[in-house]
Amino acid sequence: MVFPAGDLASAVTSLPRVRSTLQLDPLTRVLLIPLAFCIWWIPMQPCRASDLRYQLGKRVHRFEAAWEERDSPEARARVLTPLQAAVSAFFSGNQTAAGKAIDQACLALDEAGASPEQQLWHSLNISLATPLIPLGTPELELRVERGYKLPETPEPTGMMEMALLRGEQVCSEGATPWTQLSQTFAVPTADLAEGDYRLRVRLKQGERQFEFPRQMLSVTANPARRLSKLADDEAALPEETPKSFRRTLRDTMKELTGLLGASRPETDYPAHALLEQCESWSSQLARGEAIRLATGPGQYWISPQEDRRAARCRLLWPSKQLPVADQAATDPVKPRPLVIALHGAGGSENMFFDAYGAGKIVRLCEERGWLLLAPRLSPLTGTGLELPGLIAAVDALHPVDRRKVFVVGHSMGAMQGLNLTSRSPEMVKRLAILGGGQRVRQVDAFQQIPLFAGAGAEDFGRGGVQQVARQFRQAGLTLEERDYSQVEHLGIVQVALDDVFRFFEAEETP
């Protein structure tokens, strides 16, 4: 459950310019638009609210990673109630209660139950003053405090061991006794070279050890001055600079500038690498040279733009080579299948990469050598670009196998997946909707597109999925419908993704 990186003002000002809006029935629109204002307001709050958003994302990732390893019918039964509470708290805007419920679900994976000490450890937040520091900063300050209260709170004891890592190499470390529930610690950073590091914090109590979710810390020389210069250079770029290049540069600069301010982003950005990339792009564009927004295997943030319509996206270029049978012998760069993943309300382009099974879809695409694109959605403006524009943006960076473009959407993203596909059915081989849906206005558009419709038996979005499935059955269209027992709205994506990818790979209709 990751929170949006945009703001309400940008969503509203783009309304007259964007065609790719959700086509909702009147009742759904009445329900979603107030929800959109509630959710999009969250990032505009001060630092504490943005840190709560970040901490909630870390809790979800910790739970989903544990659930992926320990999933079973019995485990699903134990986590069902706290997950339902988490979803309810999230949509009511209570991030603290949502985080507590997620931790309860994580602890419930162990059938033996959790001790008061384990409950306390899970309740703790590790908060950085900033995730981006200037080169030569003497030390990094971090704060350990409870994210929420517990009925029973053991006394804080043990040692907090902190280390900054590049890969698994320890570059700086320190240890301090943990004696207070709210306590500030410091890690020496004066001797760190420029780069992007992972902060590892472990609590040791005798033979017991608890490791907190790792966070990123970036060290770079003069970040404020360099970002200010970048802003001036971007404003001076030639008018003929391609819109997608300029928009990607501007959006990335905005994310980096936020790291220096009071807000905490929802995800871990490799800020040093991104800043150097922006400087390289800016220099090339100033000389009138073309740039490549993605140059090889890895993950990228891009902002393709057509006219005044744009989409902030996260892209996976997998490192695995395609099987020989899938490669065209004459192509120097082999076209790859593409999955377009559409998140639910309150999410962003980072949600499928960080959540929904701790980024499970990334692993599934990596294993197959498939490209993955996750655009940011808004209940008010949709994706910004239609499917042809999104596919073309990826194809400009790495050839896309146009015969194998798949779309998967969750909740609001499921509705958007139906809308986008109905407007460009020739672009999509197969479509999957999870935990959401609405009446399809043009069912005939799906004559050649098999649909996977999945919902949890305890999912409040189940009715929408069933409505779409019913339309497909009545029209005699190709459909695979799955209902997952003891699964609710948050867990449906993680639970169903294996079936979704099996469905995508099937050559015969189900």
PLM regions: where:
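Amphipathic, heptad-repeat alpha-helical segments
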Residues: 47-79, 124-131, 135-141, 220-255
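Long, contiguous interaction/targeting segments characteristic
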Residues: 50-118, 339, 408, 489
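Short, compositionally biased P/S/T/A/G/V-rich stretches that sit at domain boundaries
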Residues: 106-136
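A domain-start/cap signature at the N-terminus of enzymes
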Residues: 125, 170-184, 190-336, 470
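Short substrate-entry loop that stabilizes the transition state in hydrolases
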Residues: 323, 331-336, 341-381, 461
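Gly/Ser-rich "nucleophile elbow"/oxyanion-hole loop immediately N-terminal to the catalytic nucleophile
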Residues: 329-334, 382-411
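Primarily recognizes the serine-hydrolase "nucleophile elbow" in alpha/beta-hydrolase
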Residues: 403-448
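C-terminal catalytic histidine-bearing segment of alpha/beta-hydrolase fold enzymes
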Residues: 454, 460-510
